[in-house]
């Protein structure tokens, strides 16, 4: 079978996807005693499951015929778009209209849509016949799923962040703004904030610098708020979502407890949102309508805010505190380990400051102990010469406290010289 150039690109299994496949195959066979600290799934919180089930049952009873038994608008259902504009206008004092909103089947699809529209070969001043403009990640590491967004080869470029030590066992990344400013091929800037895998949120001065660059280059800055304000608030944010002519804000319900239903939405200026709606119409027609009804109910009733405040935020705060306490207690003092500073998030991101350390070697060692983590290199696109990428790994905070406790003990044992 012959694949097109685009087909060859999109049919390739990314590094992290191969890890996820390895986890799925390993855990599906043999005893069920694996400790999976590599998962990207949000936690299955019973109270969150019950709340979404209740909202879904209400939508089924009242909206099934109108939502599931006929097509709908590609921008999103009128009820959800109205709920979104009302929620954000009231919360942040914005003046959104439906023309500022695009609802899509998951934030991954919205990011893919924006990448296809605003980066790549074309008529943009930064485009060239050989390569076109790029999707630029201003801070690498960042969400590994971004690396599969572009239909053309080498379409995603990461700007390596500088790890800055803090105290004995902490560090924090700093933006490489000089290297970012030197890029003449920016088609779109893309950043998760708070970030995956680090939980790091941009501060006001950093955000001003990124928005200023987007304005000067006349390109969009897409901010992925999957972990931040106003939901799910798993990791604390330092600034509210910015409303700016050159910013596309992307929000999802996945980390609020609804990952399987693939509902997300983008908010931005009409110049960006209108082509995104057209792209969605041509590619997916529209997002699932019954779940749009569910989310509209959650927003307008205030039940989503209560779920986040009373259930989701406390869960991850507790797991973060437990993980930090355990790592401090059991990780060997002889190992130069550092945890990315933060007060929340779905993950712990580690840097082993030792040139002899290799992330995939740790992965294989822990796999023999029936523990899964994620090697750090998969979060660094297009930076093979950066040795830091092989000195990191990610641990999920979504598992049960029992799994976390035993898994962290085995990680400590694997790190001992």
Tell me the role of every PLM-derived stretch:
Residues 65-217, 222, 228-244, 248, ...:
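Conserved core of the PLP fold type I
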Residues 127-132, 151, 243-317, 329-330:
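Conserved core segment of the aminotransferase class I/II
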Residues 1-75, 86-90, 185, 217-219, ...:
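N-terminal "arm"/small-domain region of PLP-dependent enzymes with the aminotransferase-like
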Residues 19, 37, 84, 101, ...:
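Generic structural signal for small/hydrophobic residues in well-ordered secondary structure
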Residues 36, 310-324, 336-352:
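Conserved glycine-rich beta-strand-loop-beta hairpin in the small C-terminal domain of fold type I
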Residues 356-362, 402-406:
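Short, conserved charged micro-motifs
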Residues 82, 86, 90, 95, ...:
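PLP-dependent enzyme catalytic core of the Aspartate aminotransferase-like
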